[in-house]
Every structure is written in structure tokens, then in C-alpha cells.
């Protein structure tokens, strides 16, 4: 099975080698038929401490690294 890749905004970079990424998605409400935004926060492993709060990061599933971390950030794309 392929690993999921999600994109979100880093909301916290306070932990050592850890960032918290907020991923937003849109759904259609089943009764109201209105588009609603939903978000979820993921703890992700950042080996090089490269990401700072406010930056856009892509995360990919990985084997569990700790109690909360089962995602890791992909390296920044070089421009």
C-alpha cells in the first residue's frame, strides 16, 4: 500500500526534531450540502529541524517513532 502524503502548515516547532502540522480538508455536510473545512494536527518527525512555524510542509506516513509521531516531514524542495 502506498504511503499517504499530506500537506499542511507548521503550527509549532517547539519540540526537538518534532513539528506539529495542521492539515485542512474540505467536506460536504451530508444534511446541509454545504462545504465545511475540517482540520487535524499531526506530530511529525523533522530530523534536521528545518521547518519553522508558519511554513508549508509535506508529511508522509512512517513507522511509529514515538507515542505521537507516526509521520515525518519530507525534505524542503530546493529552489
Curated annotation (Swiss-Prot):
Cellular component per GO, a single term: cytosolic small ribosomal subunit
Pfam family, one: Ribosomal_S17
GO annotation, biological process: translation
Assigned keywords, A-Z: Ribonucleoprotein, Ribosomal protein, RNA-binding, rRNA-binding
InterPro entries hit by this protein: NA-bd_OB-fold (IPR012340), Ribosomal_uS17 (IPR000266), Ribosomal_uS17_bact/chlr (IPR019984)
Source superkingdom: Bacteria
Gene Ontology MF: a single term: rRNA binding
Biological function: One of the primary rRNA binding proteins, it binds specifically to the 5'-end of 16S ribosomal RNA.
Family the entry assigns: Belongs to the universal ribosomal protein uS17 family.
Oligomeric and partner information: Part of the 30S ribosomal subunit.
Entry protein name: Small ribosomal subunit protein uS17
Organism in which the protein naturally occurs: Caulobacter sp. (strain K31)
Gene that specifies this protein: rpsQ
Amino acid at each position: 500500500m502506498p504511503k499517504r502524503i499530506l500537506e499542511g502548515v507548521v503550527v509549532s516547532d517547539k519540540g526537538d526534531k518534532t513539528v506539529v502540522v495542521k492539515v485542512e480538508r474540505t467536506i460536504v455536510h451530508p444534511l446541509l450540502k454545504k462545504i465545511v473545512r475540517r482540520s487535524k494536527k499531526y506530530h511529525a518527525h523533522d530530523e534536521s529541524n528545518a521547518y519553522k512555524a508558519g511554513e508549508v510542509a509535506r508529511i508522509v506516513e512512517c513507522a511509529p517513532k514515538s507515542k505521537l509521531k507516526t509521520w515525518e516531514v519530507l525534505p524542503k524542495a530546493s529552489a
